[in-house]
Amino acid sequence: MSKQLIYSGKAKDIYTTEDENLIISTYKDQATAFNGVKKEQVAGKGVLNNQISSFIFEKLNAAGVATHFVEKLSDTEQLNKKVKIIPLEVVLRNYTAGSFSKRFGVDEGIALETPIVEFYYKNDDLDDPFINDEHVKFLQIADDQQIAYLKEETRRINELLKVWFAEIGLKLIDFKLEFGFDKDGKIILADEFSPDNCRLWDADGNHMDKDVFRRGLGELTDVYEIVWEKLQELK
């Protein structure tokens, strides 16, 4: 399968395929935090992220969620449907943590009565600012119907993920999703789902996600390996 590099990101490289509607995503051994300010090469991270994300997307596909995932090709590669990415990070919070706690001056780990969905404008030059529905419409990113769908689909995905992670003894604190338009103009889930873009705590409150790297709490791959081993219990 011939391929040409079309995009190189912080965590993945994207390549063309012989089918114009399909791409290959290759996961890197690179860890970044604070929008790339902190950056390190972490051996084995790409393999773990690809394993975890492929597993989660397969389960989401089976549960009826429309995603870009087609199949896992190798240890670090997966075949995906090509999408036009919507320049929004859709964040869902089940508990207070991270920037939410800092923004509102509250402790981490407080359960939210109703999960909160937030939008962040995907723009590195602007440091991905927090925006609301009106900003989304002003920037012509999405209309009212599309905004409602993004929120509804994110909440539906959350209900699935919470159950799966609870079954393996992990609490889903929050996560970030990205969506895109497929060749038919349908909004589908894209990007990845791994400890890179979610917060997971175990029963003792230990971080099982990229906060280990952000906050210097331990070895990233050790934690990701534990998450991967636990996920396989769901099979």
UniProtKB/Swiss-Prot annotation:
MF terms in GO: ATP binding; phosphoribosylaminoimidazolesuccinocarboxamide synthase activity
Signal peptide positions on this chain: none
Pathway it works in: Purine metabolism; IMP biosynthesis via de novo pathway; 5-amino-1-(5-phospho-D-ribosyl)imidazole-4-carboxamide from 5-amino-1-(5-phospho-D-ribosyl)imidazole-4-carboxylate: step 1/2
Pfam families: SAICAR_synt
GO biological process: 'de novo' IMP biosynthetic process; cobalamin biosynthetic process
Catalysed conversion reaction: 5-amino-1-(5-phospho-D-ribosyl)imidazole-4-carboxylate + L-aspartate + ATP = (2S)-2-[5-amino-1-(5-phospho-beta-D-ribosyl)imidazole-4-carboxamido]succinate + ADP + phosphate + 2 H(+)
Disulfide bonds: none
Domain of life: Bacteria
SUPFAM superfamilies on file: SAICAR synthase-like
Keyword Secreted carried by entry: no
Keyword Transcription assigned: no
Top-level enzyme category: ligase
EC number(s) reported in the record: 6.3.2.6
InterPro entries in the record: SAICAR_synt/ADE2_N (IPR028923), SAICAR_synt_PurC (IPR033934), SAICAR_synth (IPR001636), SAICAR_synthetase (IPR050089), SAICAR_synthetase_CS (IPR018236)
CDD domains: SAICAR_synt_PurC
Keywords on record: ATP-binding, Ligase, Nucleotide-binding, Purine biosynthesis
Protein family according to the UniProt entry: Belongs to the SAICAR synthetase family.
PANTHER family linked to this entry: MULTIFUNCTIONAL PROTEIN ADE2, SI:DKEY-6E2.2
Protein name (record): Phosphoribosylaminoimidazole-succinocarboxamide synthase
Lineage start: Bacteria, Bacillati, Bacillota, Bacilli, Lactobacillales
